[in-house]
């Protein structure tokens, strides 16, 4: 009888284990995806900015940094694309921190500064990073910032070289200091090449300023009506509409954040590369190596943080002489001979 009882007990235990293992795994929350985990790997949580992945710009660049870290450093990650970067981002950052699973939590974009600070104060032992904002005097937050005005100076120089109407345009998402840095550098670079050139800036505004291609196209068409024949954008996914307008109207455009040249080959002269992917990868590498620093990082041309593409589709259009001039301008920015202001 005793043996029978023991056997029944073992059988019951096995049935319980099998039944638990057969249950469907919990699904991630809406907007959240998980990369496959490996034992002992650093886990990174990331909350994207407005527009999310697929913008072929800012967010996609951050994602490339994660992918590289996964491949080269063996990290795993969870990612979240908020529909509302306000309360939704705050909740997701807190959820990551509360889990205790993440060695690093990254907030992509200036709009999450207040949310990140609030959560970082609640979890002082948790490492955080924010892109495109400055958080100081917090021992657990690293800030990754870029000298967009320097890269945009090069874009302005290219625009001035290629403009036949002596009028160039800029489409920004929202009129905030960060986006205005792009326009400021653009103007300075254009006037360095052609002091009398005219620049017209226009901003999209609204709650979907970084993800409204239709609005981007409409704004670009307004600039074209005012004789702008080269248009530079700093508007995330909204810029896709700028490219569409440029292609239809037979003018040039300039991309931003990622290499967007192949979206409309020959129409997009170049793109202002903002190497968010490099910054994200390097920070993750520091964390995996145990050297996380809670400081403000600044990435300019000298630090390979910003710059132009390789003009894959437009070398012949721009010409060797102009490309040589661009290299000279770049060298002067690196040496400090040309100083670029972040404001107009």
Can you name each region flagged by the protein language model?
Residues 6-14:
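Hydrophobic helical h-region of N-terminal Sec-dependent signal peptides
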Residues 16-19:
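C-terminal motif of bacterial Sec signal peptides marking the signal peptidase cleavage site
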Residues 22-344:
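A residue-level marker of the well-folded mature domains of exported/periplasmic proteins
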Residues 1-5:
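Positively charged n-region of N-terminal signal peptides that target proteins for export
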């Amino acid at each position: 009888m005793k043996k029978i009882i023991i056997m029944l007990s073992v059988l019951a235990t096995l049935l319980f284990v099998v039944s638990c293992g057969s249950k469907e795994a919990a699904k991630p929350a809406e907007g959240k995806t998980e990369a496959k985990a490996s034992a002992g790997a650093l886990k990174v949580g990331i909350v994207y900015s407005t527009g999310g992945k697929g913008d072929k710009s800012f967010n996609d660049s951050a994602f490339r940094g994660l992918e590289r870290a996964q491949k080269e450093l063996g990290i795993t990650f969870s990612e979240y694309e908020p529909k509302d970067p306000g309360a939704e981002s705050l909740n997701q950052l807190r959820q990551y921190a509360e889990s205790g699973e993440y060695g690093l939590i990254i907030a992509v974009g200036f709009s999450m500064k207040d949310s990140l600070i609030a959560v970082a104060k609640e979890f002082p032992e948790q490492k955080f990073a924010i892109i495109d904002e400055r958080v100081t005097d917090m021992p657990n937050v690293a800030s990754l910032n870029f000298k967009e005005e320097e890269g945009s100076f090069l874009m302005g120089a290219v625009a001035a070289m290629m403009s036949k109407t002596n009028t160039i345009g800029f489409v920004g998402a929202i009129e905030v200091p960060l986006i205005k840095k792009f326009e400021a550098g653009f103007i300075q670079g254009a006037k360095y090449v052609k002091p009398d050139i005219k620049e017209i800036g226009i901003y999209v505004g609204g709650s979907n300023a970084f993800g409204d291609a239709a609005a981007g196209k409409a704004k670009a068409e307004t600039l074209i009506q005012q004789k702008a024949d080269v248009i530079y954008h700093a508007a995330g996914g909204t810029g896709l509409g700028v490219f569409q307008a440029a292609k239809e109207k037979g003018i040039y455009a300039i991309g931003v954040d990622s290499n967007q040249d192949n979206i409309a080959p020959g129409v997009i002269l170049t793109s202002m590369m903002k190497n968010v992917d490099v910054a994200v990868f390097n920070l993750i590498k520091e964390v995996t190596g145990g050297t996380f620093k809670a400081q403000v990082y600044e990435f300019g041309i000298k630090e390979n943080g910003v710059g132009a593409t390789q003009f894959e589709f437009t070398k012949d259009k721009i010409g060797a002489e102009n490309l040589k001039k661009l290299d000279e301008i770049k060298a002067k920015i690196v040496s400090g001979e040309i100083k670029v202001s972040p404001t107009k």
